[in-house]
């Protein structure tokens, strides 16, 4: 079920996404009666399922949302699911490679390196209400009264970016700039540590422009902390397929199938809080994905000579 999110021209534009990954806040959701402690449960290796989440938003906000999803998943699998929002994008790849995670949600480019370095296998992703693979876009915004009209005007200016290696918060914006002849050294890039922080830097007048992707835009607008009418978007990327949820490669095939089936049969209501952070509102049931759905990201990483060191 390969999706054509990237036209040939869009692929060239998108040819510079960057990775995503993991970090540190852990929480165990759901300890169903009759889990692994009551006997052998092939769906419950080690007595719990460790589920890593990339830190694309404040962990204090992400954890409760993923706990809802994890609780529903734990009931279907009869096994507690432990949610861990990792500290940074590279940490999740390392955690899966070292066998510290059973499942991991990676950013699109992060999945490239999770696949190559940890053998992560994609299971599902987030679907729209019409049951299609959802997507999001990177963007660069300026204040409404800014004299900057296009990204070509950013030469010599300051730009707030998210985390190093972020698909939409780092690599895509820099690739867009490169496309108009602006090298990294031609402007001041401020890595703020995350998407919300980049938005805040623009809002507080600390930079001339900031990366704001459609997910962060939806979250901040919904929370009433950002008014888009006070700002302008001067650049946007091609659509990016949303994050895949992956499984460790050495998991038992029966476990992989059980987890995939459980995700696919989750009620959209159990996905809704996570979907809101991913700009998938309202969400549909989760949808099966394969490596083919993210092939443009693999092509991009190769074209840009990106490695896991770019995380």
PLM region descriptions:
Residues 14-19:
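Bacterial Sec-type N-terminal signal peptides, specifically the leucine/valine-rich hydrophobic h-region
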Residues 21-33:
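Bacterial lipoprotein signal-peptidase II cleavage site
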Residues 39-52, 57-64, 68, 240, ...:
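An extracytoplasmic/periplasmic, membrane-proximal ligand-sensing/linker region
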Residues 50-74, 86, 109, 133-200, ...:
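Bilobed "Venus flytrap"/periplasmic-binding protein-like clamshell domains
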Residues 53-55, 85-89, 99-118, 126-127, ...:
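Beta->alpha turn/N-cap motifs
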Residues 75-84, 100, 178-192, 228-230, ...:
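A local structural motif
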Residues 121-132, 187-188, 222-239:
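Short beta-strand->loop
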Residues 137-148, 240-254:
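A bilobed periplasmic-binding-protein/Venus flytrap-type ligand-binding module shared by bacterial periplasmic
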């Amino acid at each position: 079920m390969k999706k054509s999110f990237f036209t040939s021209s869009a692929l060239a534009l998108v040819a510079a996404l960057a990775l995503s990954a993991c970090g540190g806040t852990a929480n165990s959701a759901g300890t169903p009666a009759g889990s692994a402690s009551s006997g052998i449960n092939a769906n419950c290796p080690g007595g719990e399922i460790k589920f890593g989440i990339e830190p694309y938003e404040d962990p204090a906000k992400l954890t409760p949302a993923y706990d809802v999803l994890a609780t529903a998943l734990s009931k279907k699998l009869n096994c507690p699911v432990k949610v861990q929002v990792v500290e940074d994008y590279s940490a999740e790849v390392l955690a899966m490679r070292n066998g510290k995670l059973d499942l991991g949600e990676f950013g699109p480019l992060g999945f490239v390196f999770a696949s190559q370095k940890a053998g992560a296998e994609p299971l599902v992703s987030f679907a729209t209400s019409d049951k299609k693979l959802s997507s999001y876009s990177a963007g660069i915004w300026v204040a409404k009264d800014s004299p900057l009209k296009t990204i070509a005007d950013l030469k010599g200016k300051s730009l707030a970016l998210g985390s190093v290696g972020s698909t939409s918060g780092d690599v895509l914006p820099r690739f867009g700039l490169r496309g108009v002849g602006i090298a990294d050294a031609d402007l001041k890039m401020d890595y703020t540590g995350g998407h919300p922080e980049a938005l805040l830097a623009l809002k507080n007048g600390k930079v001339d422009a900031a990366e704001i992707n459609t997910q962060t835009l939806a979250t901040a607008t919904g929370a009433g902390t950002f008014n888009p009418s006070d700002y302008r978007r001067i650049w946007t990327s091609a659509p990016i397929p949303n994050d895949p949820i992956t499984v460790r490669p050495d998991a038992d095939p029966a476990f992989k199938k059980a987890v995939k089936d459980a995700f696919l049969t989750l009620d959209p209501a159990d996905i809704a809080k996570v979907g809101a952070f991913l700009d998938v509102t309202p969400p549909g049931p989760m949808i099966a994905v394969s490596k083919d759905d993210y092939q443009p990201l693999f092509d991009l990483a190769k074209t840009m000579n990106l490695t896991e060191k770019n995380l």
